[in-house]
Amino acid sequence: MGAALSSQWARLLGEATGDEARGARVVAWHVRAADSDWVSRVWLGAQNDSGLPAPAIAVDGSEGWWVCFALPPQPSARPQAEAVALLRELIRSWLNQGGAGVSDKDAAAWRFACWPNEAPADGVPVPRQVGPDRWSAFVAPDLVPVFAESPWLDCAPGEEGQAALLNKLQPIPAADWGRLLAASAQGASGRALQAAGDGEAPAASASTALQGDPRAFLLSVMNDPGVELALRIEAARVLLAHG
């Protein structure tokens, strides 16, 4: 691919190498063709329910879709586990608000790709030729029904059109990402308390969180073994950043 498309991917993925590239700057959620109606639901849910930039939509060239989210820019890629865990939770929430009835088990089986960690050597995950007369490509949201039964292009897409679609993918603001992480951590802490029953340590943690002290809440998340490790790490990062 030429300069226009490569520059758009460079904007999103950066030029980090080695350890700095081992993580996520763009996370793509894979959707089966049979669940094509989910693509539009999530595209709308990200914007209307959570106030996030619109994700990019791509046919994968074989069996379904990629719904792509650009993460907040920072010197190094975000931890892959953190990014996938939060987006998995958000996507399930958006779908279930529309009555999809996605269970924890269903969501756990979803497939995600994290770029640049899993990106091809040329740094261009989409579009690509994935088989004879089968190409992955970005598509406009209103074209999702057109590709529902055949999620591919028969020939290489035009570079300028692909670059224009990718140009619309903007990173999630850092403040919004932090807000969503904190909400997820608080929910996880509450679930841990419920699972623990009358245990004194979780009860103390939840009590502190409910008092409305942000620093105390972050400390409780960081020290709560019932919270996912990625969220505990994020709480520690926020504490270090703000003193």
Give, region by region, the residue ranges found by the protein language model.
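Charged, helical or coil segments that form electrostatic protein-protein
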Residues: 195-234, 239-243
